[in-house]
């Protein structure tokens, strides 16, 4: 006969299994979407990322790519090849975080774009790794510069930042 404690344990195991299943399914869907974007460029560095993101986006747009660009910061913007208008990045209630890249990739695929120029929004080195290896999987990476800034997160020396 099941005791209340046994039932609670089974319920917890089922919930964990469901969360794990949903996470694996979402990761597979995201990877499938990424594979539909042949050119993915990740812009990283301390200063000037938005400017370089816009420049590379404009070059690709001029070269007839169906390119979408995304800048970050306090005025994060989406740039689309088919219009001059820039659109604000619509954020979920939890605010800006690297997880929003899943939604960006979904938009890029929905628009049938063949290129994404994405400014890295992560400062923490661990998040930068997740941003690149799991969320964007860029086939071109651009490091704009390395400067002594964000040293509380990136490290005490320029070498650590690099």
Task: Spell out what each predicted region is.
Residues 46-48, 73:
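Short polar catalytic/cofactor-binding loops
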Residues 31-36, 58-141, 145-162:
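ATP-dependent carboxylate-amine ligase catalytic core
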